[in-house]
Amino acid sequence: MQDCGGLRLVELPAALVAASPTLFVQHAMATQIALASLPDVSELLRNLLDGPHPAVAGRLAGGFRAIGRQGLADEILGAMRGAGYAVNEVNPIEKPLHALLPGGRAESPCVQRLRLMWAGMREQVVAAFPPASGAPKDIDALVKDVEARYVTDAYHSLSIEGYRVTAALIEKVRDGGWNPDGDDKDRSARDAMAARGYLETHKLVKEDLVRVIKGQNAGTVFRQALLRWVQALFRTSVQAGILKPTDLAGYRNDQVFIRGALHVPPSKEAVRECMPVLFELLEAEAQPQVRAVLGHFLFAYIHPCMDGNGRLARFLMNLMLVPAGHVWTVIPVEGRNEYMSALEQASSLANIAPLASFISELAEAQAEGPLAPPR
C-alpha cells in the first residue's frame, strides 16, 4: 500500500496481479494505460513469483504483447519458466489501443489517456463537421469579419465565465474609454478588467490567425502563443495588484476543481507532462476541425491555468477553425448548460459526439450570419 494525498492505494504492480480477466474487457482503456505505464516488470515479477501466480503471469504477458511491449512479455515468461512454473500466454485484451507508447517508451497515465482520447475521438469529430472551404485568400476581409464579431464574442465568452458585462462596456474598453490609470472606479472594476484582458488577447489571436493562414503549423503557433495569451488576459489584474507577476509565469501551481463537474483536472505535476503532448497532438493533426474540437476539449480537460481556461480554450478553437475557412464561432451564453454538459460528457464518459455536434452546428449557423449583437 502507498499513501497518495491521504488515500491508501494499492501499488500498481500488485493491482495488476489482482486484476481479473473481465477487468481488461470492462475497463479496457484503464488497464491498457496501466500496462503501458510500467517502466519495467521488476516489481511485477516479485508479486508474480511470491504468489505464485503462473496463470496471472500468462495473462499479463499476453497483455503486454498486445500493446506492443514484447520485451516485457518475454521477461515475464522467461522469469516464471526459469523458476519452474508452467506458464501459458493468454491475451486478455480484445481491442488493443494502438496510440500507446510512441517509440516504445513508458509514459505517465495522464499522457497515455490524452493520446488514447485523441485517437479514439477524432473520427467522430470528422464525421460531425462539413468540409472546410480552405484557407481564406483575402486576409484583410477575414480580419475585418473577425473584428465585426468581436463585441458579440467577448460578451458571450465573458458571460459564460460569470462576468457581468454589456455591449456598451465592451465597446468602451475597446474604444479606449476605460482608464484604470486615471480613474479609481475604473481601476477596481473587475468586469472591465476582464473585458480589457479579453481585448488584448483577442488582438494577439488575430495576429496568430494570420500566421496560420500564411502557412505556419497551427499547433506550433499555439505552442508559441499560449504564454503570451495568458499574460495578455491577466496583465490588467497584475497592474491592479490583484495578481502577482509570478502568477503569470507558467502553468498552475495548485489543484483546481470545476464547479458542478465530475471531472477533476490533473494534478499540477501532471499538467507539465500533459501540455507538451497536447502541443504534439495539435502539430501532428491534419484535420482543422479535429484540432479545434479536441484542442478545445483537452485544453479544458487539463485546465493548465489557475483561471481563464474556458476563454483560452475558445480562442484555441477559433485559431484552428478560422484559417481552415470557418467563421469565427461564438459559443452563446444561452447555450451554456448544453456546452458544459457536452464538455462533461467528453471528460467523464469519453463521449465527444455532443461537443463536436454542438460546435459544428454553431459554426454552420454563424457562417450564414453572425449572432445578433447583445443588447
Segments from the language model and where they lie:
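FIC/Doc superfamily catalytic core
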Residues: M1-R375
